[in-house]
């Protein structure tokens, strides 16, 4: 009996060490050498301080900043561990809202967002990504149209010409990956950091 179990146990231990230890360590080391910024989380620094990651969205509020997509992520309610509460861009709990197209709560939330955005920029069509969440709830990017939609609000709040802000958005647009994958996009964190630099000049 032992002679039949021994090869299985040896193979199980060997594969565990190989795939659970050696392979992950090798890939982590290789990634750190070939792609040091990406392997460290694509962190963004300003004045020597980490202010975010290019890969995870942040909740920007107020009229002076570009806003990202809505986020449906949640966190445990500190007053009742059996409940959750909204926590936009919570990377520890990535996920969508599970609200389907027939959900009254989703329809009400989108309607309220559309009305708020129409009041902000009357006459302009509201870009869909400003009222819909991504599957992960962590999307760091918006469409160029969504960024341009917000220009009048930011120009008024920061006392900057709209043309300068449109040029800023155009400079931050990233094309399709490899020219084929995805859509043109703007990283909201990078755009807001560039906005702060522009406003500081």
Curated annotation (Swiss-Prot):
The residue range of the signal peptide is: none
State the membrane topology: Single-pass membrane protein
Give TM regions. 17-37
Per the record, its GO cellular-component terms are: plasma membrane
Q: Name one Pfam family in it.
A: KdpC
Q: What would you give as a GO molecular function for this chain, any one?
A: P-type potassium transmembrane transporter activity
Assigned keywords, A-Z: ATP-binding, Cell inner membrane, Cell membrane, Ion transport, Membrane, Nucleotide-binding, Potassium, Potassium transport, Transmembrane, Transmembrane helix, Transport
User: What are the subcellular locations of this protein?
Assistant: Cell inner membrane
Which family is it part of?
Answer: Belongs to the KdpC family.
Q: Which HAMAP family match?
A: KdpC
Q: How does it assemble?
A: The system is composed of three essential subunits: KdpA, KdpB and KdpC.
Main function = Part of the high-affinity ATP-driven potassium transport (or Kdp) system, which catalyzes the hydrolysis of ATP coupled with the electrogenic transport of potassium into the cytoplasm. This subunit acts as a catalytic chaperone that increases the ATP-binding affinity of the ATP-hydrolyzing subunit KdpB by the formation of a transient KdpB/KdpC/ATP ternary complex.
Q: What is this protein called?
A: Potassium-transporting ATPase KdpC subunit
Identify the gene encoding this protein: kdpC
């Amino acid at each position: 009996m032992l002679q039949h179990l021994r090869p299985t146990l040896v193979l199980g231990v060997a594969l565990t060490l190989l795939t659970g230890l050696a392979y992950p360590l090798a890939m982590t080391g290789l990634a750190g050498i070939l792609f040091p910024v990406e392997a460290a989380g694509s962190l963004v620094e300003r004045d020597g301080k980490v202010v975010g990651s290019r890969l995870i969205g942040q909740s920007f509020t107020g009229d002076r900043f570009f806003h990202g997509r809505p986020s449906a992520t949640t966190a445990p309610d500190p007053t009742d561990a059996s409940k959750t509460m909204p926590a936009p861009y919570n990377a520890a709990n990535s996920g969508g809202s599970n609200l389907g197209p027939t959900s009254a709560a989703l329809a009400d939330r989108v309607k309220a967002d559309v009305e708020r955005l129409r009041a902000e920029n009357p006459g302009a069509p509201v870009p869909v990504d400003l009222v819909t969440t991504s599957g992960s709830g962590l999307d760091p990017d918006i469409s160029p149209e969504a960024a341009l939609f917000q220009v009048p609000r930011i120009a008024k709040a920061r006392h900057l010409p709209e043309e300068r802000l449109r040029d800023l958005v155009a400079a931050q647009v990233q094309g399709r990956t490899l020219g084929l994958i995805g859509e043109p996009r703007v990283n909201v964190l990078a755009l807001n950091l560039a906005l702060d630099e522009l406003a500081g000049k």
